[in-house]
């Protein structure tokens, strides 16, 4: 049942399209017949219309040729030099800034004048005219000349330097070395004796040696030691 319905719809749309095509063909033929007809007396002819079109094209071309000159004149008018008016800044505190700018301009002019020599000498932004090498060296204080005393001149004898002379004057005649002296031939025993002597000295500071002053006391102590206890120590026990 679905297939015959689809066919009927297709036939309906096909017929509709055919009718539209026929209507378009009829309207086109009518317009062509009207165009082929002669225009009225008041209307301009085709030749006059063509000539008018040619004149319009020529005018457009001439207008285009004139436009570039006008554009150049306008551009020239736009690039006018601007002249800055001088203003009095004496009331304001801007003079220092203006002076610094003037100094920078002067330095740039000097660098431009020097040209290639500036780069060859290795300037690269530093002015060689101002530097520590151009500063005037301060006057050095005069160095006082040291006057040395003249040495005594010896007419005879052998020359000796001053150091040798001083050593000779301080020397003393030396005899043979002392073998048993601890100072010339030190040993470990000498150090031990030295420590003992130091101890003895310290003991002497704290104790006093007394000789032959307490003989009576010594004899009394001896007699007490010689006494014998002959009493019966156990007699007390017998009495009880």
Curated annotation (Swiss-Prot):
Give the matching InterPro entries: CDV3
Q: What is its main location?
A: cytoplasm
Compartment(s): Cytoplasm
Query: What family name appears in the similarity comment?
Result: Belongs to the CDV3 family.
Organism per entry: Xenopus laevis
Q: GO cellular component terms?
A: cytoplasm
Q: Which residues form the signal peptide?
A: none
Write down the superkingdom of origin. Eukaryota
**Compositionally biased, Polar residues: which spans?**
127-141, 181-192
Q: Where is the composition biased (Basic and acidic residues)?
A: 1-15, 57-73, 193-204
Sites of N-acetylalanine modification: 2
Q: Which spans does this entry mark as compositional bias, Low complexity?
A: 27-52
| Protein name per UniProt | Protein CDV3 homolog A
* Region named Disordered: 1-204
Against Pfam families, the record matches this protein to: CDV3 (PF15359)
UniProt keywords, alphabetically: Acetylation, Cytoplasm
